[in-house]
């Protein structure tokens, strides 16, 4: 006898709806076969129809408006019985469109819900969208519900049947499983190793109680000397201990390792963190690759634009005469080509002239920047003896290679030492030169004598000259000429003579300006330091107090803003209540007037009837 054929379907329950929602959260809205495997009484098509027709949050379950009713009637005239197309246009399900259309037709025909003519209504395009007859629509005994997917779920019983309990337990187990195959295998291996270790310890304990001592390690020396790749690290190089104490770090590492082992043994390895880290690394790698591609593309485009500009500047237009032209036209075309060539030559000359100007400006700029470089402080090399410029005198005694070396070398000259003494002492001592714009205007300064004024003007002129020569050549100023050495020596001699004739008693010695060095001065300095320290502490305390004041001010401001908001809310509510009271009072007055007028009319009618 063949087994009974079980047809899937039937009324949906709350348990099945919840399982369907949880499965869609995990698997999505495309894996209907996998979702239907959690519901043994439903097929994949029924599961999809239940989601699309009833459970989807995208469904429009609001009341129908007049505009939608008019649109539904017009669309049914255009697309008769094409409920799928009509539902897509109205953003509703086909069952909703069918039921609404049937309701509108019944209302227009005057048919009530309890009439027999209701059974002649329309049906949808398929079994999933037929007007369903659920538990709430008054199914007769023995009738079959053809489309329960679009109707509310049946309430659960107080005691669930065994098959629904099994279905719920299996769904919980499958949907709550977040570990992969590898994590499960690792957990099984870990549990197996733990059980083996516990069994070995139990066996050793029993043997020890019987008087037999058994070690966990083997006694075979050959096997004991073999390397255990599971327990140790092959070719491990332990780093040497450094100057710092790492005992606390090692304790922390051991604690974290033990904590991680306990977490893995209880909960297992979470693959989510590893997957997230791998995804972040892949996204970062992709971003770097895209960034490199963009940089290469930009460089390639820049190089291509430069090459194209260079080629365009070289390229000339090819002007050929049309075929079959006369001699006169040929001469015209020849003249035009000659003029074009001349114009091209002129344009090339202009381009070359502009390039030469740019090169000259760049060369001047480079020269100015090189002139700003300070002279070398540490020169190494041997000082060659002075040799006359006439090489013919000693050519016989020197080889050709020596002559080339001597000609390429820079021989010392007395003029270099003489010139170095003719520049200003500030430059000789490599002291900083002030900027000319920072100097005071001499017109605003009052001088006692004319000599002081001349000295100040000469000082200004010398500063501008040195700054222009050694820092910035574009600054306004006149460079001073080199001084005559004889004149400089004469001035120095005059200064020495005048200094020798001066009275020694009037000259202050340098000893008067030496700072005192004794114990009292040290004590006074220490006292001053203590006073400065105390003042600094007072200032810091004041700063801290000011910060406390600022915090209190911020708190007060927050309280004020909060109170102001509350006051504004209360004021708004008061104004609203006041407006409502005014409107209600006006409405009451109008209603009283209306009622009084009606009472007067009734009184008049009563009087007339009497």
Curated annotation (Swiss-Prot):
Location relative to the cell: Cytoplasm; Nucleus
One cellular component term from this protein's GO annotations in UniProt: nucleolar peripheral inclusion body
Record-linked Gene3D superfamilies: Homeodomain-like
Coiled-coil segments on the chain, per record: 162-206, 337-368, 585-610
Gene Ontology annotations of biological process type: filamentous growth of a unicellular organism; mRNA cis splicing, via spliceosome; mRNA splicing, via spliceosome
Major subcellular site: cytoplasm
HTH myb-type domain ranges (all copies): 1-55, 56-109
Family matches, as PROSITE patterns: HTH_MYB
Single GO molecular function: DNA binding
Pfam families xref list: Myb_DNA-binding (PF00249)
Keywords: Coiled coil, Cytoplasm, DNA-binding, mRNA processing, mRNA splicing, Nucleus, Repeat, Spliceosome
Highest taxon above the source species: Eukaryota
DNA-binding region residue numbers: 32-55, 83-105
Subunit structure of this chain's protein: Associated with the spliceosome.
PANTHER family named among the record's database cross-references: CELL DIVISION CYCLE 5-LIKE PROTEIN
Family the UniProt entry places it in: Belongs to the CEF1 family.
Protein name from the UniProt record: Pre-mRNA-splicing factor CEF1
Organism of this sequence: Candida albicans (strain SC5314 / ATCC MYA-2876) (Yeast)
């Amino acid at each position: 006898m063949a087994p009974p054929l079980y047809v899937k379907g039937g009324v949906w329950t709350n348990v099945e709806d919840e399982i369907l929602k949880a499965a869609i959260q995990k698997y999505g809205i495309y894996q209907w076969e996998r979702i239907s495997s959690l519901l043994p009484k439903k097929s994949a098509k029924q599961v999809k129809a239940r989601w699309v027709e009833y459970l989807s949050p995208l469904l429009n379950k609001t009341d129908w408006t007049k505009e939608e009713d008019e649109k539904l009637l017009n669309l049914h005239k255009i697309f008769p019985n094409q409920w799928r197309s009509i539902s897509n246009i109205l953003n509703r399900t086909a069952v909703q469109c069918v039921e609404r259309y049937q309701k509108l037709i019944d209302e227009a025909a005057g048919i009530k819900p309890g009439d027999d003519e209701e059974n002649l209504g329309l049906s949808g395009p398929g079994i999933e969208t037929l007007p369903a007859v659920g538990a709430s629509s008054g199914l007769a005994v023995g009738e079959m519900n053809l489309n329960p997917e679009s109707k509310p779920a049946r309430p659960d019983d107080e005691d669930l049947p065994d098959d629904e309990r099994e279905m719920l337990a299996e769904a919980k187990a499958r949907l709550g499983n977040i570990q992969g195959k590898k994590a499960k295998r690792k957990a099984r291996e870990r549990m197996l190793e733990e059980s083996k270790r516990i069994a070995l310890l139990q066996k050793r304990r029993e043997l020890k109680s019987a008087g037999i001592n058994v070690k966990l390690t083997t006694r075979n020396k050959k096997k004991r000397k073999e390397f255990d790749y599971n327990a140790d690290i092959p070719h491990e190089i332990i780093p040497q201990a450094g100057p710092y104490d790492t005992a606390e770090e090692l304790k922390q590492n051991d604690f974290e390792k033990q904590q991680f082992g306990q977490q893995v043994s209880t909960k297992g390895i979470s693959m989510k963190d590893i997957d997230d880290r791998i995804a972040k690394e892949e996204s970062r790698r992709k971003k770097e690759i895209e960034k490199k591609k963009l940089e290469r593309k930009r460089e390639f485009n820049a190089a291509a634009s430069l090459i194209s500009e260079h080629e365009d500047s070289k390229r000339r237009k090819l002007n050929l005469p049309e075929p079959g032209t006369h001699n006169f036209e040929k001469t015209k075309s020849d003249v035009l080509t000659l003029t074009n060539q001349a114009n091209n030559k002129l344009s090339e000359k202009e381009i070359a002239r502009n390039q030469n100007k740019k090169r000259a400006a760049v060369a001047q700029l480079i020269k100015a920047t090189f002139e700003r470089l300070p002279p070398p402080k540490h020169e190494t090399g041997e000082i060659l003896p002075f040799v006359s410029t006439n090489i013919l005198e000693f050519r016989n005694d020197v080889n050709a290679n020596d002559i080339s070396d001597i000609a390429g070398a820079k021989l010392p000259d007395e003029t270099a030492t003489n010139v170095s003494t003719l520049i200003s002492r500030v430059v000789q001592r490599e002291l900083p030169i002030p900027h000319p714009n920072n100097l005071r205007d001499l017109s605003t300064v009052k001088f006692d004598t004319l000599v002081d004024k001349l000295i100040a003007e000469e000082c200004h002129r010398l500063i501008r000259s040195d700054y222009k020569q050694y820092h910035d050549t574009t600054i306004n100023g006149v460079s001073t000429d080199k001084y005559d050495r004889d004149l400089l020596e004469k001035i120095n001699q005059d200064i020495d003579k005048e200094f020798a004739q001066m009275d020694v008693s009037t000259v202050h010695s340098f000893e008067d300006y030496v700072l005192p060095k004794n114990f009292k001065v040290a004590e006074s300095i220490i006292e001053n330091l203590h006073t400065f320290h105390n003042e600094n502490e007072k200032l810091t305390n004041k700063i801290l107090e000011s910060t406390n004041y600022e915090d209190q001010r911020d708190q007060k401001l927050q309280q004020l803003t909060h109170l102001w908001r509350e006051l504004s809310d209360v004021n708004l509510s008061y104004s609203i209540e006041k407006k409502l009271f005014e409107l209600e009072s006006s409405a009451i007055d109008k209603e009283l007037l209306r009622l009084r007028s009606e009472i007067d009319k009734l009184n008049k009618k009563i009087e007339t009837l009497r």
